[in-house]
Amino acid sequence: MSDLFDKFQPIIDLREGLLAAGGEDPFSLVMEKVLSPTQAICNGRETILLGTYNYMGMTFDPDVIAAGKQALDDFGAGTTGSRVLNGTYSGHRAVEQALKDFFGMDHAMVFSTGYQANLGIIYTIAGKGDYIVLDIDSHASIWDGCKMGDAEVVPFKHNDIEAMDKRLGRIPEGAGKLVILEGVYSMLGDIAPLKEMI
């Protein structure tokens, strides 16, 4: 009888081999203190954070910290349920209204993480009989959102406008199409030619 976890043995063996050969365990890095949006004390040493998601440097902004403390005082440490179950917090409505107005849209919706946004939106919008045309180097969360739904996924070569147009041209007339691009590709750091692609 096979154990459910047997399939992980090759990965375990590889990791143990790397460690035995003097490789460093990537999970041994401990961040003891964050000093700034780009620096922390890791394993006792000051370290530059090259993989941070702190894109706008707001984690140490005094106004953001004060608002976070106030939100904890007003609402506690969590919503204790979904919007459908418990309702929507006034702060969520306020930020969605501000985003809607700023971008000149009919509606805006916030998610806790970008990953959740991609999961929640993509498979909801594109379903059976629809097509998702996306850059091959899109973030894993985008791919996961595509996998959750029933739409046909059609990838194209990274940042290649001609390849994208060719894929779009092959989609049946009348089918729903969702084109997914990233403004800045988080995995590569390069920028999509959005003006030309839209």
Residue ranges and their predicted role:
Residues 1-19:
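Short, compositionally biased leader-like segments
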Residues 13-75:
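N-terminal "arm"/small-domain region of PLP-dependent enzymes with the aminotransferase-like
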Residues 57-58, 85-88, 140, 161-162, ...:
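Short, small-residue-enriched loops and turns at beta-alpha junctions
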Residues 66, 71-113:
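Conserved N-terminal alpha-helix of the aminotransferase class I/II PLP-enzyme fold
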Residues 121-140:
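Conserved PLP-anchoring active-site segment centered on the Schiff-base-forming lysine
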Residues 128, 148-150:
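Short, structured coil segments at secondary-structure junctions
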Residues 154, 158-198:
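Active-site phosphate-binding strand-loop segment of PLP-dependent enzymes
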